[in-house]
UniProtKB/Swiss-Prot annotation:
CDD domains: DnaJ, terB_like_DjlA. This is Co-chaperone protein DjlA. It comes from Yersinia pseudotuberculosis serotype I (strain IP32953). It is found in: Cell inner membrane. The chain crosses the membrane at residues 7-31. The transmembrane domain is a dimerization domain. Residues 32-277 are cytoplasmic. Residues 211-277 form the J domain. One of its GO terms (cellular component) is plasma membrane. The lineage of its organism: Bacteria, Pseudomonadati, Pseudomonadota, Gammaproteobacteria, Enterobacterales. The gene is djlA. Pfam families: DnaJ, TerB. SUPFAM superfamilies: Chaperone J-domain.
Length: 277
């Protein structure tokens, strides 16, 4: 059914410019429309295995690129990446593939924007997958306990290519920062700390009401209805089985579970502090 654009273009072309020239111009415009719609359809109907494979490869490619942004990949960086692979229980061929993708991302000529554009196309209409992808990259950026200015700039590029505005990204960053206090996905070595506009800061031990509100993306002054709505939305977006069905690699299912546990812990803390069920 990829001829409707050409047919419509032909009709409109003849209507506005009678003759061969109008017909040719209409067909040309219609052909371009058909190609654009076809690309969107391919993204929307990409099979699950294709999305999972691309998600897996792109995750480690971009992670390698992000790590290299600081200037030089150190042994600590490699160890942190290996810890993530351990959390995913990657062994054998899967681990080798992840390591190869990580090395590809470190190359100076790695096409970051093009890679992200292809990833976004295949994830068409699945923002929850894009959200998980960005959360994993934030883990990589904060793995050593701080956010390098160059890493921040790369993260802005990642967000931009994935259709996330600067304001949305800053909200992601605040939510991620709150999650670090719950001992979840925010740090591979259990660092405690926070990030503000001025940089990395030491945070008090143990999560606070403010931390929990950051995780859910709400304010401490919000009522129970707004908080419950935010909680349910986040839990729905991070449901491991649903994410795998949409294209999350099975290897990353454990990370989705940990994020869901973090959201639950934050919600429980808010309920205790604010006194509602």
């Amino acid at each position: 059914m990829r001829y409707w654009g050409k047919l419509l273009g032909l009709v409109l072309g003849v209507m506005y410019a009678p003759g061969v020239v109008g017909a040719l111009l209409g067909l040309l415009v219609g052909h371009m429309v058909d190609r654009a719609l076809g690309a969107k359809r391919r993204g929307f109907f990409a099979d699950q295995q294709t999305r999972q494979s691309l998600f897996f490869r792109t995750t480690f490619q971009v992670m390698g690129h992000l790590t290299k942004a600081k200037g030089r990949v150190t042994e600590v960086d490699i160890q942190l990446a290996s810890q993530l692979m351990d959390r995913m229980q990657l062994h054998g061929a899967a681990r080798t593939a992840a390591q190869q993708a990580f090395r590809e991302g470190k190359e100076s000529h790695f096409p970051l924007r093009k890679t992200l554009q292809e990833f976004r196309r295949v994830c068409f209409g699945r923002f929850d997958l894009i959200r998980i992808f960005l959360e994993i990259q934030l883990q990589a950026a904060f793995a050593d306990g701080s956010l390098h200015p160059n890493e921040r700039q790369v993260l802005y590029v990642i967000a931009e290519e994935l259709g996330i505005s600067r304001g949305q990204f800053d909200q992601f960053l605040r939510m991620f920062d709150g999650g670090r206090q719950f001992g979840g996905h925010g740090g591979w070595q259990g660092q405690q700390g926070g990030y503000s506009q001025s940089g990395y800061q030491r945070a008090p031990q143990g999560p606070t009401l403010e931390d929990a509100c950051k995780v859910l993306g709400v304010n401490s002054s919000d009522d129970s209805v707004a908080i419950k709505r935010a909680y349910r939305k986040l839990m729905g977006e991070h449901h491991p089985d649903k994410l795998v069905a949409k294209g999350l690699p099975p290897e990353m299912m454990e990370m989705a579970k940990q994020k869901a546990q973090e959201i639950q812990a934050a919600y429980d803390l808010i309920k205790r502090e604010k006194g509602f069920k």
